[in-house]
């Protein structure tokens, strides 16, 4: 069965925005929103064709950030604040890719949640 392709409305956005980067051990997700929190563009490593263990590499993080940033740049976004969350590989590569795509990074904040000795962590891997 053929899928119906929907045409997205191209809405111009304000030049200020917020980039949320979630870098887990298994994947990287980048969401770009306006200041109010409405999503302008998003991307993930899986959406960009990476599968399995390749999703948590710095290169996958770079490609994911470039894809989301290019779409936001085309809609008129220029300056962004970056909120980064999670322990995954490629956190720095994602920020550098945002700058390479033409977005000016105004501030970077690490909002990784840290427990005050809450849940017991999973046991250590023995490889």
UniProtKB/Swiss-Prot annotation:
GO cellular component, one term: ribonucleoprotein complex
KW Chaperone (keyword) present: no
Gene Ontology BP term (one): translation
Residue stretches spanning the membrane: none
Coiled-coil intervals, chain numbering: none
Signal peptide: none
SUPFAM superfamilies found in the cross-reference section: Translational machinery components
Keyword field contains S-adenosyl-L-methionine: no
Gene Ontology molecular functions: rRNA binding; structural constituent of ribosome
InterPro entries from the UniProt entry: Ribosomal_uS11 (IPR001971), Ribosomal_uS11_bac-type (IPR019981), Ribosomal_uS11_CS (IPR018102), Ribosomal_uS11_sf (IPR036967)
Keywords, in A-Z order: Ribonucleoprotein, Ribosomal protein, RNA-binding, rRNA-binding
Biological role stated in the UniProt entry: Located on the platform of the 30S subunit, it bridges several disparate RNA helices of the 16S rRNA. Forms part of the Shine-Dalgarno cleft in the 70S ribosome.
HAMAP family with a match to the protein in the record: Ribosomal_uS11
PANTHER family hit by this protein: 40S RIBOSOMAL PROTEIN S14/30S RIBOSOMAL PROTEIN S11
Record's protein name: Small ribosomal subunit protein uS11
Gene: rpsK
């Amino acid at each position: 069965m053929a899928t119906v392709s929907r045409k997205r409305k191209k809405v111009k956005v304000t030049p200020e925005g917020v980039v949320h980067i979630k870098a887990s051990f298994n994947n990287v997700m980048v969401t770009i929103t306006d200041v109010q929190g409405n999503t302008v563009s998003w991307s993930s490593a899986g959406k960009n064709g990476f599968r399995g263990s390749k999703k948590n590499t710095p290169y996958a993080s770079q490609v994911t950030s470039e894809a989301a940033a290019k779409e936001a740049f085309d809609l008129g976004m220029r300056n962004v604040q970056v909120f980064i969350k999670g322990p995954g590989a490629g956190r720095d590569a994602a920020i550098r890719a945002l700058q390479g795509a033409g977005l000016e990074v105004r501030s970077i904040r690490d909002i990784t949640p840290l427990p005050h000795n809450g849940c017991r962590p999973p046991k250590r891997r023995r490889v």
